[in-house]
From Swiss-Prot:
Belongs to the ATPase epsilon chain family. It holds the Pfam family ATP-synt_DE_N. The lineage of its organism: Bacteria, Pseudomonadati, Bdellovibrionota, Bdellovibrionia, Bdellovibrionales. It is found in: Cell inner membrane. This is ATP synthase epsilon chain. One of its GO terms (cellular component) is plasma membrane.
Length: 140
C-alpha cells in the first residue's frame, strides 16, 4: 500500500506527493505515527519536530513545524503548517542565543498574558529547532 506525503506552508512547499513509509507528527494530544493504511483523520498540529521516511530509505528526514493541520486519507498525508523549517535552514547558534535572551527577558520583566502566550510559542519553536538541528548529521 502506497502513502504520499505533502508538506506546505504559506511561503513554500517542502514536499509534494513523495512516497513515504512512515510519518510522525506532533499532534495536539501527542506524537502521532502514521503508516500506510492509517484510518482517515484530520487533526491539529502543535509546534515540534515532524519526521518521515521516504519509501525504501532507512534515514528519517525531519522538519520543525509550528502549528497547522494534518489530514490523513487513503491517498496519503497532507501537512498544512504555518511554518516549516528544514534542519539545513536552521542557524543553531542564533537559535540558542534567541532562546537564552528570551528566557532572560521573561525572568526579568512583568509581562501580559498575551506576551506570555507569545513567549511560549516562540520558546517551543526555538526548542524544536534546536532538537532538529542537533539530530541532523554534521555536514562535511
Amino acid at each position: 500500500m502506497n502513502m504520499k506525503l505533502t508538506i506546505v506552508t504559506p511561503e513554500k512547499r517542502i514536499l509534494v506527493g513523495q512516497e513515504v513509509d512512515e510519518v510522525t507528527v506532533p499532534a495536539f494530544k501527542g506524537e502521532l505515527n502514521i503508516l500506510p493504511g492509517h484510518a482517515p483523520l484530520i487533526t491539529t498540529l502543535e509546534t515540534g519536530v515532524m519526521k518521515w521516511k521516504l519509501k525504501g530509505k532507512e534515514k528519517q528526514d525531519l522538519a520543525v513545524i509550528s502549528w497547522g493541520y494534518c489530514q490523513v486519507s487513503p491517498e496519503g498525508v497532507n501537512i498544512l503548517a504555518n511554518i516549516a523549517d528544514l534542519p539545513e535552514e536552521i542557524d543553531l547558534q542564533a537559535t540558542k542565543e534567541f532562546l537564552a535572551l528570551s528566557e532572560k527577558k521573561i525572568m526579568n520583566e512583568l509581562i501580559t498574558d498575551e506576551d506570555w502566550a507569545e513567549f511560549q510559542r516562540d520558546w517551543a519553536h526555538a526548542r524544536a529547532k534546536i532538537e532538529a538541528a542537533e539530530q541532523q548529521p554534521a555536514k562535511k
